[in-house]
Regions:
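Aromatic-residue-lined binding/catalytic grooves and analogous aromatic/hydrophobic interfacial grooves
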Residues: 1-281
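Active-site neighborhood of glycoside hydrolase catalytic domains
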Residues: 288-290
């Protein structure tokens, strides 16, 4: 059995590819879940998750973002798809492609229309085409820069062993180059023009209630996320931050007037995607002007 998984900016969805070296050897069921605030149903042969989050003020009032996700299975070499109440089963398949689309109503009010359209467009392509488009979209950014600091004999070591060896002997220059490219990978994977800039916890946060609400800390963290943008030839990935900053102006003007009776605009140490510009959290540091 082989499994490949990637998320694609080219098609704006996740792709799971399952194969077996024996005909009709794939037999499985799949579902979706999260820790809270969700409902999963089978909708035809799709699996549909829907929910609405708390508003962040009153956890009993479910008036926050709405979200939805669909999973559609495609069997290029045949097999059977059987929907259940909250799972979908596949029998006697040799290859399966699971397409996972998702959206919130932050950008798209027609959630189901959005995620259904993504699946319809991606479903017209075979797996090779989906993967090719994904790799091309990534490499169009990643391949712009190479960094050669020299080589060492440790380059073939597993990363945990390589890091342990580095603690004992720092003569591993290509590890620094790899770490440089890792930073570029994180920014490339986090945003595109027209989307939001990467936040404090990033896309890979593993908790529902993220530390510091996954906000934008303006003292240094937001800047650190964008350090690779200009110097590492990823300038367009700086644009989401520029647009986000523009969105703070109207709110920041009200904050400047209310708190300081000042002209212009101001924000403080905490920001978010809803134009929060007032002092926040603790008075010892929450009033830091930015």
């Amino acid at each position: 059995y082989d499994r490949e998984v990637f998320t694609s900016f080219a098609d704006d969805l996740g792709v799971i590819h399952l194969t077996a070296d024996t005909d009709k050897a794939l037999n499985f069921s799949f579902g979706m879940n999260r820790p809270e605030h969700y409902k999963v149903t089978a909708d035809g042969n799709d699996l549909l998750m829907q929910g609405q989050l708390p508003d962040g003020v009153d956890t009993l009032e479910m008036k926050g973002l709405r979200y939805a996700s669909r999973v559609r299975v495609i069997l290029p070499k045949g097999g059977t798809v059987t929907p259940g109440d909250s799972t979908v089963s596949v029998q006697n398949a040799s290859e399966a492609i699971l397409l996972v689309s998702m959206a919130t109503d932050y950008f798209d009010k027609d959630l189901d229309g959005k995620i259904t359209s993504l699946l319809a467009n991606a479903g017209k392509k075979d797996y090779a085409s989906l993967k090719k488009a994904h790799v091309a979209a990534y490499r169009s950014l990643f391949d712009r820069v190479e960094l050669d600091l020299g080589h060492s004999s440790r380059e073939d070591l597993p990363m945990d062993e390589r890091l342990a060896a580095f603690n004992e002997d720092q003569d591993d220059p290509s590890l620094g180059a790899l770490y440089f490219q890792f930073g570029r990978y994180l920014l490339i994977s986090s945003t595109r023009v027209g989307l939001l800039p990467p936040n404090l916890q990033g896309l890979w946060c593993n908790t529902v209630n993220t530390p510091w609400n996954g906000d934008y800390h303006l003292n240094i963290n937001l800047q650190m996320n964008h350090w690779p943008a200009e110097v590492a030839n990823l300038s367009e990935l700086h644009l989401p931050l520029v647009e986000w900053t523009k969105q703070q102006v109207a709110s920041g003007e009200r904050t400047a007037k209310a708190y300081y009776n000042a002209r212009g605009w101001v924000t403080h140490i905490l920001g978010n995607v809803w134009e929060f510009t007032a002092p926040g959290e603790h008075p010892s540091w929450g009033a830091t002007n930015t």
